A protein has these predicted regions:
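Short, low-complexity Ser/Thr-rich regulatory SLiMs
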Residues: 199-203, 260-264, 341
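Active-site "cap" helix and flanking loop/linker of ATP-utilizing ligase/carboxylase catalytic domains
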Residues: 237-258, 264, 274-322
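Short, flexible active-site loops
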Residues: 220-230, 272-285
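Active-site nucleotide/adenylate-binding loops and adjacent lid/helix of ATP-dependent enzymes
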Residues: 109-196, 200-246, 358-359
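ATP-binding N-terminal substructure of ATP-dependent carboxylate-amine bond-forming enzymes
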Residues: 1-118
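Peripheral (often C-terminal) accessory segments that flank ATP-dependent C-N-forming ligase machineries
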Residues: 5, 13, 298-364
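Protein kinase-like catalytic core scaffold
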Residues: 208, 256, 268-272
């Protein structure tokens, strides 16, 4: 294993930031980089990747193609990711060739729900109760009544790899439906609402956090984020402090998303960590001095972090599936429309988002 390369100097305008992954996050990162005079080179295994439409250079190859990854790295000054499920071998290879952030340790933690929860708890931060499940009988024994959620330890997002269960036998059957894939059984949290913190840490250790939004989900997919969330100033500060402790413990560089449950008693529980720009931070494009996408590029390119101050209240709503077909109405509803350039509309697929802003009314 090669030692990870460290960025010795900021990437100057005209330089190239490599982005592994070509989805909408890579697309918006590329647009933000261009505003700073930086080029992006996008690597994706999908010929119709949305980010290919807006980048300066592209590589179409598999994430297990070592030769293609090496050529990609040679063309970049720094490298980052737009999704967390990067194959470990690819992350290791790239980090030994060019400065690559977030680091491999952060990716490894975020790729495994069990490791993630153990990591967060070791920092003294609360999570939902959970137990590892390696076989059906583990699920049966771990079920403690009420409701619980069985989740695969790896490769879960937007509700994939999850089943809500209401009995020990149902938990066991759910595990069997996962075909023996390692899982965790998580106690169901009767939360008041969900929130998140999108924050950034720079190469110099500087930290900046955005105001937490309230997040509403439908069918396990984020539907809307509203800022400010109905949190007290103390809760908002606590949420940002949680994100900072996690980022510092990971020696993290880049933007990170920390998803939270807010219980009815006001307690904050960490649900998941996303080592990348986050869907619940899209509102920052219109409502903040520095968007999460510019902030991430600044961090991984070794630039000073920008100002995360929110100058407006915001409501961000995802455009999902067939809703994108009504683009005429979406383009005239008074919001800032972002369509991702995806070639095919599919049920449950995020096709874009709209953000509405209004005068700022709250502190957090």
């Amino acid at each position: 294993m090669s030692a990870a390369k460290i960025l010795s100097a900021p990437v100057a305008p005209g330089g190239t930031v490599g982005i592994l992954g070509g989805g909408q996050l890579g697309r918006m990162l590329s647009l933000a980089a261009a505003r700073l005079g930086l080029k992006t080179h996008v690597y994706s295994d999908a010929a119709d990747a949305p980010a290919f439409q807006v980048c300066a250079a592209r590589t179409l190859a598999g994430y297990d193609d070592a030769a293609a990854l090496e050529r990609f790295a040679a063309a970049c000054d720094a490298i980052t990711y737009e999704f967390e499920n990067v194959p470990a071998a690819a992350a290791e290879l790239l980090s030994g060739l060019k400065p690559t952030n977030p680091n491999a340790h952060a990716l490894a933690i975020a790729q495994d729900r069990g490791e993630e929860k153990n990591f967060v708890r070791a920092l003294g931060i609360a999570t939902a109760p959970f137990a590892p499940v390696e076989k059906a009988d583990d699920a049966r024994k771990a079920f403690a009544g009420g409701r619980a959620v069985l989740k695969t330890r790896r490769l879960g997002y937007d509700g994939k790899g999850q089943r809500t269960v209401a009995s020990a036998d149902e938990a066991a059957r759910a595990f069997e439906s996962f075909r023996g894939v390692p899982a965790i059984l998580e106690g169901f949290v009767d939360f008041a609402f969900e929130a998140s913190v999108v924050a950034a840490r720079g190469c110099d250790g500087a930290f900046a956090a955005y105001d937490p939004p309230k997040n509403d989900h439908e069918n396990h997919i984020l539907r809307r984020s509203t800022v400010p969330a109905p949190l007290s100033s103390a809760q908002a500060d606590e949420a940002k402090a949680i994100a900072r402790r996690i980022a510092e413990a990971l020696d993290y560089v880049g933007v990170i998303g920390v998803e939270l449950f807010v219980t009815k008693s006001g307690e904050l529980l960490v649900n998941e960590i996303a080592p990348r720009v986050h869907n619940s931070g899209h509102w920052t494009i219109e409502a903040c001095a520095t968007s999460q996408f510019e902030q991430h590029i600044r961090a991984v390119a070794g630039w000073p972090l920008g100002d995360p101050t929110r100058h407006s209240d915001a409501l961000m709503q995802n455009i999902v599936g067939e809703e994108a077909a009504d683009w005429r109405a979406l383009s005239s509803n008074g919001g800032a429309l972002h369509l991702y350039g995806k070639s095919e509309i599919r049920e449950g697929r995020k096709m874009g988002h709209v953000t509405w802003i209004s005068p700022k009314t709250g502190a957090g």
